[in-house]
Amino acid sequence: SVKSTIANNLKVKIAFEKLNESKETIEVAIGKKLPTVTGTISGTYSNSDTTSAAGVSTTPETFTDKYKISITQNLYDGGEKNLEIERSKIIYENAVINFYKTVQDLSLKAVEGYLTVINYEKSLESSEKNFDSVSRFLEEVKLKYELGSATITELKNAESAFSIAETNLFSAEQNYKVSLKTFESIVGKEAINLEDYVNVEDNLNFENIISEVYKNNFNILIAQNNIKIKELDLSKEKSSNRPTLDITASTEYSDGSRIDAGSENTNASIGLTLTIPIFQQNIDKSDIRKINSQILQTEIELEDLKDNLNIEVSNYYKNYLVSKSNLNTSLLTIEYANTLLESTQEEYNLGTKSITDLIEAETNLLNVNVEYFNANKNYLINYFNLLALDGSLIKLFEEYLPSYN
């Protein structure tokens, strides 16, 4: 299901195409270091008559065709092209990170959808068991009432409990059906057993998580790369003040003998051009100051991002611990509710407990089971959100990622 999600989701497809687009930026940057080759073909027809006191003179008709090839190669540009290649590689790296981030966000959404399905599935199972038990109790009370061994109050209480159980069952069925449709719309397939696929680590350490977040969080990696890009922009701007050296070679062939007798010419030339920036209206200095300001902004944004992530991790970790504690409490509560139901059933058989007591014990078991499923869902959602923040959630689904090399 994860593979289907990644393969078919439109956001993933867009991120993958942006990755391909940024790959072409590297090709363009490398291509700028190659020579420029141009070819020129021209044709000129000429014919003239001149009238003077001496009479009329006519220049023979000629059609001259020329063929010229020029090659220009930069020999030195202050390192600007190399800087642009390095810059384009970092932009591509950001595209890869953004692709991973898109897949991870989608995987997290799929996980949450899966947990919702499982939660409603378990709630439905408990509601079905509760409905069966209450139905059985109602039939038993009806029989006893007909025999005169049960009161009208007990009968009405059993009917009320049946009505509530019936409503709970209908609600659980609808919730489960809707969750299946929602999950299938996200993933494209039915839910699998996530806990069979993922080995959930029971003890997460806050300091370790924060350390991994600062090293591997996708937003932090992108922000760090943005600083590098701005620093390269600054180096490129400074290199624009340096001289550049280009070499140009050309060869030309012309034939002017197509109509009347003419001539053929072949020319070749080679030259060096040294360009020295002297004054650029202070635009370069202004751009340097602007880029320095942008570098400072991206550095501040990175620190602000770290602070926000620290708060986000703290909240998820707190919720993780609370949900873990609630999960353990729910297990103990279920154990107690099962024991209470068994005890109440025995006492009911002995006549020391009423049908009302038995229905209450059965309903209580349903409620604590539902609470457990909710606690388990919250526990796993907090767990996977922590994995997403430190960038490790994507590792669970790496085998489903398309190749981008």
Where are these regions (language model features)?
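Short, charged, amphipathic alpha-helical segments
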Residues: 86-89, 152-163, 292, 355-364
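Small/polar (Gly/Ser/Thr/Ala-rich) solvent-exposed segments
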Residues: 13, 36-62, 72-101, 221, ...
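Periplasmic alpha-helical coiled-coil/stalk elements that build and connect Gram-negative outer-membrane
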Residues: 97, 102-216, 316-319, 323, ...
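Bacterial Sec-pathway N-terminal export signals of envelope proteins
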Residues: 1-38, 187-231, 306, 313, ...
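C-terminal structural cap/anchor segments
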Residues: 287-336
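Acidic, low-complexity, intrinsically disordered peripheral segments
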Residues: 1-2, 371-405
